[in-house]
Curated annotation (Swiss-Prot):
Gene Ontology CC: plasma membrane
Lineage summary: Bacteria, Pseudomonadati, Campylobacterota, Epsilonproteobacteria, Campylobacterales
Family: Belongs to the MntP (TC 9.B.29) family.
UniProt protein name: Putative manganese efflux pump MntP
Transmembrane segments: 3-23, 35-55, 56-76, 107-127, 129-149, 166-186
Organism (species): Campylobacter jejuni subsp. doylei (strain ATCC BAA-1458 / RM4099 / 269.97)
Function: Probably functions as a manganese efflux pump.
Topology of this chain in the membrane: Multi-pass membrane protein
InterPro entries: Mntp/YtaF, Put_MntP
Record carries keyword Repressor: no
Amino acid sequence: MDFYSLIFLSCALGMDAFAVSLCKSFSVKKLHLKHYLIVGIYFGGFQALMPTIGYFIGITFASFIASIDHWIAFILLSLIGLKMIKESLENENCNSNAKQFGFKTMLALAIATSIDALAVGVSFAFLNVNLLLAIFLIGIITFILCIIALKIGNKFGIYLKNKAELLGGLVLIILGVKILIEHLFFD
């Protein structure tokens, strides 16, 4: 997977965290540095950790599924993308009354938003991916997206949440199709 594909993948994976960060910003009248760090570190950290775990799960089973690896990557990325698109169309409201930045809440949200990254990590085991670069980009880009989301969310509100998830879903599906086409026609 080339550098630009990793950038697009990182942005797509960060869209769930971006959407949740928008919601987080609605619960605070004034954001402080600690809010940015809490949200960025939790989401960026878990988005980087989960593909690593997924990668090692994938290589454990690599010999069993090497001949269908491109189909696995395509199916996983497409299913994740479709899930994100479906969620973007459901119009869920953000909860602005809960304790939004506590350990349990942030841990649960970080894990929930990074499950997609775990599945992508499994597909990394079957692709030509620089794992360290991918993990770095996914973590940093998610961190940056969360910071941007907190800023934007304070200004523009819930309207943007669904658009971010929709875009992220479309990007994942496009990457899945690209991987499938490369392996079917150019290997």
